[in-house]
């Protein structure tokens, strides 16, 4: 009882890996057995087919051997026997018969007769059986390559081939003559503010310009919620413009606050995503040739490859500020507007009477940036530039200038057009109310001061950062067709290609001759050697 249980327990705890191995071995043996049986069946079928073909050939040969004497051979022998008998009978009729002589006279035999004439040509025999095909002869020798054939006629033009690979850029040609001056281009974009220059000498006070036209007054914006008065904070560092928040709900009307100071110009908005490129337009008809232009200026100004600088005109003078209007209610923060076009310079007014010398005026503000000079020579290659974020912060710091003092209040302007409602800005800290100052009397213009001394030359500034790529210029007029260039030199011979892959075995040739003729030095059979 215990032994049986132990045996059962031992059988139950068999290794599963050994069971899998045994099953795999059994499956392999079964596959080998099936493969062997299949191979035996195929070999047996092929052997039976070969045996049947051999038996059929032997039976056919036996039938031919048995039917030979009684059939074709008997007919052939019968015709020959009939021909021989007919010739013999004809010959017997033409021979002289032996004279009958008595038996007592024994004459010697006469001389032998002359040889008879050849007999007539016999009738053609029956056609024999068709012989079997001969065994294939040996392969013939390769013939020598033939002479090149005559040049063929000119073929029809073929289809356009595929576009070739782009060739290498040719050497730069000599500079062409200066072209005629182009038409005045559109006003360029407002450039970035350059670095602040050194303090120049105090210039003479200019004459007051005419009052500008009164600008249209905008509609009063919605009033925001009154903010909690906070302490006046220190001036913060100008940071990058944040993303505009979603437009909030309209607030309740608040109390009318005191007049605020002029706000700082908003930072420029982020660059929008590029639009989808438009489809290529159809090529228009070619216009008539234009009239010959006048002779252009032969002075060549090198703009260092910057075609936009060549098309840009000098910056116009700054227009006179208009009178300030009545302050309206504080509106919501609007979107940053596009930079406006510089106004035209107003006409110079009549010269006034010389006034009495007045007291020395306060130190004047920094003058406007002068016209851009001619481009200087290329400097040495600078070091690696800083990241774009630092450049953006620096450019924003240059754009955001300190606010000037508030101007005197002007007459109310007419109602302006409805502006685009911008996103609601964050509530700013409410500043303390300043004391209203008294308006002082206007001072008399002082005399023109003597010109200052020429300042010392400043140190050479560092090379500026590379500017952003300019806009594409307007396409110029189409040039005349150039002269045909000379034929280029013959290119070098290409590198020989790799050995090709061995071709497939050729098909068996036609049945050869029993004994091929010898071949001469030219690869052709020797003359006089021929076969039936």
Swiss-Prot record:
The chain crosses the membrane at residues 24-45. It comes from the Eukaryota. InterPro entries: Collagen, Collagen_Structural_Proteins. Residues 174-184, 241-250, 314-326, 403-414 have a biased composition (Pro residues). GO terms for molecular function: extracellular matrix structural constituent conferring tensile strength; heparin binding; identical protein binding. The keyword Calcium does not apply. Residues 342-354, 380-393, 427-441, 478-495 have a biased composition (Basic and acidic residues). Residues 1-23 are cytoplasmic. Keywords: Cell membrane, Collagen, Membrane, Repeat, Signal-anchor, Transmembrane, Transmembrane helix. Residues 46-532 are extracellular. This is Collagen alpha-1(XXIII) chain.
């Amino acid at each position: 009882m215990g032994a049986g249980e132990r045996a059962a327990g031992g059988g139950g705890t068999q290794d599963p890996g050994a069971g899998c191995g045994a099953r795999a071995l059994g499956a392999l043996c079964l596959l080998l057995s099936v493969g062997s049986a299949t191979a035996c069946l195929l070999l047996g079928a092929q052997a039976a087919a070969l045996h049947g073909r051999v038996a059929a050939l032997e039976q056919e040969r036996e039938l031919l051997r048995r039917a030979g004497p009684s059939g074709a051979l008997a007919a052939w022998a019968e015709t020959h026997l009939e021909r021989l008998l007919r010739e013999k009978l004809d010959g017997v009729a033409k021979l002289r018969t032996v004279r009958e002589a008595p038996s007592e006279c024994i004459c010697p035999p006469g001389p032998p007769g002359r040889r008879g004439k050849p007999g007539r040509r016999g009738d053609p025999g029956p056609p024999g059986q068709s012989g079997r095909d001969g065994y294939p002869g040996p392969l013939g020798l390769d013939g020598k390559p033939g002479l090149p054939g005559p040049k063929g006629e000119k073929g029809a033009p073929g289809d356009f081939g595929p576009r070739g690979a782009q060739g290498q850029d040719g050497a730069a040609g000599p500079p062409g003559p200066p072209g005629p001056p182009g038409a005045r281009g559109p006003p360029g974009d407002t450039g970035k503010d350059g670095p602040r220059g050194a303090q120049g000498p105090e210039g003479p006070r200019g004459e007051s310009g005419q009052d500008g036209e009164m600008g249209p007054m905008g509609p009063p914006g919605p009033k925001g919620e009154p903010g909690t008065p906070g302490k006046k904070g220190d001036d913060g560092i100008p940071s990058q413009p944040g993303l505009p928040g979603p437009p909030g709900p309209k607030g309740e009307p608040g109390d009318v606050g005191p007049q605020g100071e002029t706000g700082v110009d908003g930072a420029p908005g982020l660059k929008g995503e590029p639009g989808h490129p438009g489809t290529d337009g159809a090529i228009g008809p070619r216009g008539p040739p234009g009239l010959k232009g006048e002779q252009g200026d032969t002075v060549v100004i090198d703009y260092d490859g910057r075609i936009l600088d060549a098309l840009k005109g000098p910056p116009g003078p700054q227009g006179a500020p208009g009178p300030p209007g009545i302050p309206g209610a504080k509106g919501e923060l609007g979107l940053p507007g596009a930079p406006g076009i510089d106004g035209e310079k107003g006409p110079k007014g009549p010269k006034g009477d010389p006034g009495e010398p007045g007291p020395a005026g306060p130190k004047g503000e920094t003058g406007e940036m002068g016209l851009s000079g001619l481009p200087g020579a290329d400097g040495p290659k600078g070091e690696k530039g800083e990241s774009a974020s630092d450049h953006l912060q620096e450019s924003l710091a240059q754009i955001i200038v300190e606010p000037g003092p508030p101007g005197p209040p002007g007459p109310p302007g007419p109602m302006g057009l409805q502006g685009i409602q911008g996103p609601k800005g964050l509530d700013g800290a409410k500043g303390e109310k300043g004391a209203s100052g008294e308006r002082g009397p206007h001072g008399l213009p002082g005399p023109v001061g003597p010109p200052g001394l020429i300042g010392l030359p400043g140190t050479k500034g560092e090379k500026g950062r590379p500017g952003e790529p300019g806009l594409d210029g307007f396409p110029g007029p189409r040039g005349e067709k150039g002269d045909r260039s000379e034929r280029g030199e013959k290119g070098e011979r290409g590198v020989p290609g790799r050995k090709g892959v061995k071709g497939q075995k050729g098909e068996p040739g036609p049945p050869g001759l029993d004994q091929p003729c010898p071949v001469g030095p030219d690869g052709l059979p020797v003359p006089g050697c021929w076969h039936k």
